[in-house]
Amino acid sequence: LRPGAQCADGLCCDQCRAGEECDCGSPANCCDAATCK
């Protein structure tokens, strides 16, 4: 399971673009994941 996979609605990536910290329920913050860049 890649970081951010639990945020299927895309909210995590949206928060990341807004400059907010986002924890998708795993130790890895999805804002640091390649999938959100």
Swiss-Prot record:
Superkingdom classification of source: Eukaryota
GO molecular function: toxin activity
SS bond partners: C12-C16, C22-C36, C24-C31
Tissue: Expressed by the venom gland.
GO CC terms in record: extracellular region
Keywords carried by this UniProt record: Cell adhesion impairing toxin, Disulfide bond, Hemostasis impairing toxin, Platelet aggregation inhibiting toxin, Secreted, Toxin
Location of this chain's protein in the cell: Secreted
Further remark: The disintegrin belongs to the medium disintegrin subfamily.
Record family assignment: Belongs to the venom metalloproteinase (M12B) family. P-II subfamily. P-IIa sub-subfamily.
Function of the protein: Inhibits ADP-induced platelet aggregation in human whole blood in a concentration-dependent manner (IC(50)=89.5 nM).
Protein name according to UniProt: Disintegrin morulustatin
Organism: Crotalus morulus
Lineage: Eukaryota, Metazoa, Chordata, Craniata, Vertebrata
